[in-house]
Amino acid sequence: MFYERLEARWRTPLANNVYDGVLFGVAALGSLFSQRNTTITELHLVESARSVLDLHQISEAPSVDLVTGWVLRVIYMRMTASPHSTWIASSTLIHLIEASGLHLEPFDDTVFPQHNLLCDPDIRRRLIGVAQHVNMWTSFDLGLSRVALQSPPLAPLASKSDDYTTELLRLLPISTNLDPVKTEDNRNLEPSLRQVLSGNHTQPPSVLAQCNLVLCILRRFGTVGFNMSPTLAEQVLALLNDALRSARFLAKDCSPWHHVANVPFHIICMLLVLDTRSSLAMLPEALQTLELVASIYDTDAMKQAHSAACLLIFLHQQRRSEDVKIFRDVLQTQGQQGSG
């Protein structure tokens, strides 16, 4: 369908409609994943997409094309823009979905137009799921409110070969339950952790999303004083190791998925919190991964993240040195008493 509409657009170069925002959005993402440095062409594509979407004033329910264009815009912003601007855009997107009615399953007993009938059911669910994923995690990162759709949970996506969106969207229900405004029963945290760890995630972006959710659950554990079993801790460390490997692969592959930067930093923090010999042994690889990402994506934020990680490790070492001094003093005192 996309290529058919693209070909039709080339045949009518003077035409202008909202689907141009989709075409510009796809081209901008293609450019982002094709080269490390932003080009003038990419900036023009992004600005053209923004102009098309903003110029189509909403006088009625938003169309599927408008929502699709906004999904692409928000995906691009999640990887390139500031968190606050991405949060605002993703919140707007959820409101557009609600206004369009795409989040509702089609029903017969209505006289009102239903845009969800004009969209393939599987594509509709994917649009909604990706929009929720970006809005949810951007709001979680900032500690701000997410926009919740008043609708039943998404139906399962159709299984397709070489399609990994299903892996990502399977994480949505548990992610929703971790909303800070929810009073989640702490007894559900361990089953949720085990469920996420048992998920089959085959592609690096999906592995990073899985790891990001596990890190969120572990941080919630920290507030209730939960002690992991050795077996569960081993599974967690194995996933963290896979996530570091995935982050390095994506960074070298010019694939700036939005978790490439933040997950390695949060892994370092979690390794220090776990504070076991096995977790601390992973620190060199974790810091090297963060350093690699910072060298490839040479931004102030990445430099600050790398510096902060080094400082945290130094402070942890300093605390350990002070602990060792206490033990040494105790033994020296005991030795002096014994010789006396």
Q: How would you name each of these model-derived features?
A:
Residues 22-25, 123, 127-130, 263-267:
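Extended HEAT/HEAT-like alpha-solenoid repeat tracts in very large eukaryotic scaffold/adaptor proteins
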Residues 1-65, 72-82, 115-119, 195-231, ...:
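C-terminal transcriptional activation/regulatory domains of eukaryotic transcription factors
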Residues 4, 8, 47-52, 94-199:
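Fungal transcription factor middle regulatory core
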Residues 37, 83-87, 104-108, 138, ...:
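Short, flexible/disordered secondary-structure transition segments
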Residues 42, 46, 67, 261, ...:
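Core helices of alpha-solenoid repeat scaffolds
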Residues 82-96:
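Classical protein tyrosine phosphatase
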Residues 97, 177, 185-201, 231-340:
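Fungal C-terminal regulatory tails
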